[in-house]
Amino acid sequence: MSLKVPCKFSLTSTNKSKSIQLFFKKVFTKSDGKKEGNIVSKLSFKLAKLIDGENVIGIEAKIKTKIVGYIFLTKLQYKEDYLVYWLAPVAVDNNFQKQGIGKKIIQFALKYLKKQKVDLLMTYGDPSYYTKSGFKKTNVSIIPAPYKLSQPIGWLVNKISSKRLKIKSKPKCVLPFRNKKLWWFNKSECGLICHKWNLFF
């Protein structure tokens, strides 16, 4: 289903941290249950408090005056000379899912990052959905992840610049993501690679 009402995208600010937390909690609780809703809402609150336009970037999607989506972009710091960001989490209002908002907000993010001379945008999610936004499967031997991945098939890259890749170091992620449980989980758990994220596109 395509979006009939125009959706506007813009950078968000740290003073919206509480409303951002409630937004993520509502979306994930409805789609994935209370436990996942609590995990992602706490994560989104911590990220929102750190928004500075450099290490943590927040982007919001709005229809008229209503917020319908949020994404976070956080810096992955490698020792090599590459400017790399990480995409997660992503959420679209449950009443506006499957209308292309998730894809469009990611496209907005990619255009913004290109202007900032960013080289790569990484994510850890379902390839069948993120490939719709230009992401491609990669390997941790080519682009190392911050922690060991339980689902390495979900380690995805979107090359923004034409710079040749040669990365050997393990990246340092922002503080809220320094938790190996967010990267390694059982099949019965949702984690960052939750299959229900297709609802956002």
Feature annotation, model-predicted:
Residues 89-97:
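A short, internal acetyl-CoA/4′-phosphopantetheine-binding micro-motif in the GNAT/acyltransferase core
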Residues 27, 112, 129:
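Short alpha-helical functional segments enriched in proximate histidine and acidic residues
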Residues 145-194, 200:
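C-terminal "cap" of GNAT-fold acetyltransferases
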Residues 96, 100-108, 118:
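Conserved acetyl-CoA pyrophosphate-binding loop and the N-cap/start of the following alpha-helix
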Residues 77-84:
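A short, polar/charged loop-to-alpha-helix boundary motif
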Residues 17, 21-64, 68, 72:
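Active-site rim helix/loop that mediates acceptor-substrate recognition in acyltransferases
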Residues 6-22:
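A short beta-loop-alpha structural element at the N-terminal edge
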